[in-house]
């Protein structure tokens, strides 16, 4: 690299004449007001809560077949897609583990997962609810059936969680 030539005496004098009359800044630290950040965070949290409450109602009970594994297919989707999901033809691209979460936390995480899948164009997700007291195992299918982007879901094959997980096929807008 080339070295920058040092300024001549004439250039130095011109610079000093140009800044004549200026004074040193005593303190240049600017203290930003944190209120806008807090307002943005509160707005984002309220939007997230709205999304959870909008899609996932606890009162809604979809018609899910009681016999056999947990499964659902939207009316406008081919039942063949459900079979492919059951066989494991669609490997999950993302996993969500809900072990140890309460219903509200699980709802928020599920909403965040579906939003992320939409943003990242992810078509198949695995939601691991665990065995436990069967609370999440019963709630998650009813929540998923309410979401407009969920085409189908089926109890996961053994290699992806078996009884303690659900594979979800999503309808992602390109």
UniProtKB/Swiss-Prot annotation:
A biological-process GO annotation: rescue of stalled ribosome
Keyword Hydrolase: yes
Matches recorded under SUPFAM superfamilies: SMR domain-like (SSF160443)
Keywords (A to Z) from UniProt: Endonuclease, Hydrolase, Nuclease, RNA-binding, rRNA-binding
Coiled coil: none
Bilayer-spanning residue ranges: none
GO molecular function, one term: rRNA binding
Top EC category: hydrolase
EC number: 3.1.-.-
Pfam annotation, one family: Smr
All residue ranges annotated as the Smr domain in the record: 96-171
Subunit structure: Associates with collided ribosomes, but not with correctly translating polysomes.
Entry function: Acts as a ribosome collision sensor. Detects stalled/collided disomes (pairs of ribosomes where the leading ribosome is stalled and a second ribosome has collided with it) and endonucleolytically cleaves mRNA at the 5' boundary of the stalled ribosome. Stalled/collided disomes form a new interface (primarily via the 30S subunits) that binds SmrB. Cleaved mRNA becomes available for tmRNA ligation, leading to ribosomal subunit dissociation and rescue of stalled ribosomes.
Entry similarity comment: Belongs to the SmrB family.
Protein name: Ribosome rescue factor SmrB
């Amino acid at each position: 690299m080339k070295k920058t030539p040092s300024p001549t005496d004439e250039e130095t004098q011109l610079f000093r004449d140009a800044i004549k009359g200026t004074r040193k800044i005593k303190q240049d630290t600017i203290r930003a007001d944190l209120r806008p950040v807090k307002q943005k965070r509160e707005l984002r949290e309220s939007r997230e809560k709205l999304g959870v409450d909008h899609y996932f109602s606890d009162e809604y009970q979809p018609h899910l077949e009681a016999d056999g594994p947990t499964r659902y297919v939207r009316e406008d989707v081919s039942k063949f897609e459900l079979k492919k999901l059951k066989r494991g033809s669609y490997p999950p691209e993302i996993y969500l583990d809900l072990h140890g979460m309460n219903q509200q936390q699980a709802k928020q995480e599920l909403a965040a997962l579906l939003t992320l899948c939409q943003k990242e164009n992810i078509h198949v997700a695995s939601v691991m609810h665990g065995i436990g007291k069967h609370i999440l195992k019963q709630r998650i299918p009813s929540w998923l059936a309410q979401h407009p982007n969920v085409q189908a879901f089926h109890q996961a094959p053994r290699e992806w969680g078996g009884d303690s997980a659900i594979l979800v096929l999503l309808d992602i807008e390109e």
